[in-house]
Amino acid sequence: LTTSSAASDVYKRQPLYKDKDQFFNTPAFNYDEVITLPNNATLLSSNKVNNVMGIDFKSDLSNIWGIQYHPEITYEKMITLINFRKERLLENKSFNDENDLNSHIKIIEDEIKITNKDLRMRELKNWLNLIANV
């Protein structure tokens, strides 16, 4: 888990982040990440793990959002996925050892106790509301 920050100059006018806090916790676990933004892209959010967590850009007539995290996946499901992929995660050195992996799970379990699920999944809700009105 890491705290992501929506870029202050764009975050309030972005429909994706409507009613979302500017700083929010999110799972930050990626095998790959965006390094170079498209020429016309706007950086929406970032954190200490990934410089690019959210972008907005246009392609022809389409407005495109890209996010490097998963608001649609519950923390409980994340824990299930970590346990399911435990062997591969350890082999790939995603964690130093099993204690490190278990510590990470504990952090997520603690976050479950304090997080507002509606706010954590706000991007998904906002996106669904937008496409419902197209």
Residues covered by each model-derived region:
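Single conserved hydrophobic/aromatic residue that forms the stacking wall/gate
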Residues: L1-Y11
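Amide-donor transfer/coupling interface in amidating biosynthetic enzymes
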Residues: K12-V134
